[in-house]
Amino acid sequence: MEHPFQLLMATSIAYLLGSIMGAYWVCRYFQLPDPTESGSGNPGATNIYRLGGPVPATLTLFWDAAKGAAAVCIAAMLGLSPYEQGVTAVAAIVGHMLPAFHHFKGGKGVATVLGAGLALAWQTTLALTLVWAAVVYWKRISSLASLTAALMAPWVAWRLNPEHLALFLILSLFILIRHRENIINLAKGKERSL
């Protein structure tokens, strides 16, 4: 660890950024119900799409992705190494999943991973986004697409951005853990489509 003070500052800011849930503010603006109490109960873009359509969902997606990208940019501006930038990205994603401002009840982290990934390893993230899009187009199930991309992430990172393999392993594990209910629903054939 080359910059302990800067890393502590960056991860603290990243966690707090991650804790600002775009879904809540988008739902307030569009007068939609609380996403944690409606639809799937997840404050993420897919649930917002079901509750309010493509415009609120797109705003939620961009908000959540921007948090991940901003965390990495802050770390870079503080002169942190790529490894330390990855640690900062993880802090933002944990903030999104366990937000301090929302009783630690957050989202699944896919969009925040997308933003952080584009800022850190755009080649891997772009490839995984194409995988996600192909599965959504083929099956119309967002969670299945996210799980497929998460399972492929370590291999894709190893091929395209091997310096970030450990980060993508950790992020994949986070995504899989946060989707455990979806995995059960998929196994039972009960997962909702878009």
From Swiss-Prot:
GO terms for biological process: phospholipid biosynthetic process. The chain crosses the membrane at residues 7-27, 59-79, 86-106, 116-136, 157-177. It catalyses: an acyl phosphate + sn-glycerol 3-phosphate = a 1-acyl-sn-glycero-3-phosphate + phosphate. Keywords: Cell inner membrane, Cell membrane, Lipid biosynthesis, Lipid metabolism, Membrane, Phospholipid biosynthesis, Phospholipid metabolism, Transferase, Transmembrane, Transmembrane helix. It comes from the Bacteria. Pathway: Lipid metabolism; phospholipid metabolism. One of its GO terms (cellular component) is plasma membrane. It is a multi-pass membrane protein. The keyword Transmembrane helix applies. The keyword DNA damage does not apply. Probably interacts with PlsX. PANTHER family: GLYCEROL-3-PHOSPHATE ACYLTRANSFERASE-RELATED, INNER MEMBRANE PROTEIN YGIH. Catalyzes the transfer of an acyl group from acyl-phosphate (acyl-PO(4)) to glycerol-3-phosphate (G3P) to form lysophosphatidic acid (LPA). This enzyme utilizes acyl-phosphate as fatty acyl donor, but not acyl-CoA or acyl-ACP. Belongs to the PlsY family. This is Glycerol-3-phosphate acyltransferase. It comes from Hahella chejuensis (strain KCTC 2396). The gene is plsY.
